[in-house]
Regions:
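C-terminal nucleotide
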Residues: 1-155, 174, 197-205, 209-229, ...
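Acidic-glycine-rich active-site phosphate/pyrophosphate-binding loop
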Residues: 154-168
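Cysteine-centered functional microenvironments
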Residues: 168-178
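DPxDG-like acidic metal-binding loop motif
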Residues: 177-201
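Generic hydrophobic, aliphatic-rich segments that mediate packing or membrane embedding
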Residues: 124-128, 162, 181, 185-189, ...
Length: 309
């Protein structure tokens, strides 16, 4: 991710929109859409805040979480819908030289026309989408103080007179669910933006392990840039299934060596069907009911307090 902090001018931006996304449909005039859907995560053991990345780096042996990726179905009046990924992200080129950000569930849209607006998280309710645009490298962190117009940056990415539309959608999950919805939505948005700019090998399908780790690291970056903070286990929905996420001691080959005891990113061990048989998975699935408490909470102050302690 180091290159994102070194780009200080729009002319130095290395990313380009994937060629397949630059040709509009001749009938509708609309450009192709990148669609990404992601699970949310359930933390069965509670990490005890050990997954805050710099705490895990100080004491990697104590950073362990049993984490499950889940799709959700709603139960209304005795009728249950089919399970589906609870968060979705979409990216496409538009024929206007601006950055259009839209949250379907919040019913909010804004047109961003300057680089400074991208970094203004207090201006509207779309800070998560702004964080994704920054952390994915579309508007890299190093360009925050650049004086060039956003239009120039978008022209370099997608061509003159063009811009990007980034859309998020959360499917019927109440606030305060404790399922790390915002972090996994951030990861989904980052993955979609990375696909659109050729930073992922394919425009659709599963991410590779290396790609997942990049998405997770950028989700951490996006959370802290946006001011909400967070830990690495919250992006567990990017990985499938039931997994053990644990801190790893830094070795001589790691950039963290000599700086901290542990690595920035943890190790993800996805349990196979020999370790957790299908019957056990089925029993676990059938024994869980999620009931929302209806209490939304800003965990930023709590994270700050835990970190200070």
């Amino acid at each position: 991710n180091q290159w994102m902090f070194r780009v200080g001018h729009t002319a130095d931006h290395p990313l380009r929109i994937h060629p397949r996304l630059l040709h509009p449909d001749p009938m509708t005039g609309l450009f192709p859409v990148i669609a990404e859907s992601t699970a949310v995560r359930m933390d069965l053991t509670h990490s005890g805040w050990s997954d805050i990345f710099f705490l895990g780096m100080d004491y990697p042996a104590g950073a362990q979480v049993l984490n499950i990726s889940i799709d959700l179905c709603l139960n209304k009046n005795g009728e249950t819908s089919e399970p589906r990924p609870p968060v979705e992200a979409y990216v496409r080129v538009i024929d206007q030289p601006l950055l259009r950000l839209c949250s379907v569930d919040l019913e909010t849209t804004t047109d961003v026309r300057s680089i400074g607006e991208v970094f203004d998280f207090a201006k509207d309710y779309l800070g998560l989408l702004k964080a994704a645009v920054i952390a994915s490298g579309i508007v890299p962190p190093g360009i925050e103080s650049a004086r060039q117009p956003l239009e120039d940056l978008l022209a370099r990415l997608a061509g003159p007179g063009r811009g990007l539309e980034v859309v998020s959608k959360v499917n019927n999950i109440p606030k305060g669910s404790r399922l790390a919805v915002s972090t996994n939505l951030l990861g989904s948005l980052i993955a979609a933006c990375m696909r659109a700019t050729g930073q992922v090998n394919s425009l659709e399908g599963a991410l590779t392990e290396t790609e997942r780790r990049i998405v997770a690291s950028r989700a951490i970056l996006g959370e802290w840039i946006g001011g909400s903070g967070g830990g690495w286990q919250d992006s567990g929905g990017v990985w499938p299934g039931i997994k053990l996420i644990e801190g790893v001691e830094a070795t001589e080959d790691d950039p963290e060596h000599g700086i901290s005891k542990g690595r920035l990113l943890p190790r993800h061990h996805i349990f196979n069907t020999d370790e957790i048989p299908p019957g056990s998975r089925k029993k676990l699935e059938e024994s869980l009911v999620l009931v929302p408490g209806g209490m939304a909470q800003d965990v930023g102050p709590i994270l700050e307090m835990v970190t200070e302690k």
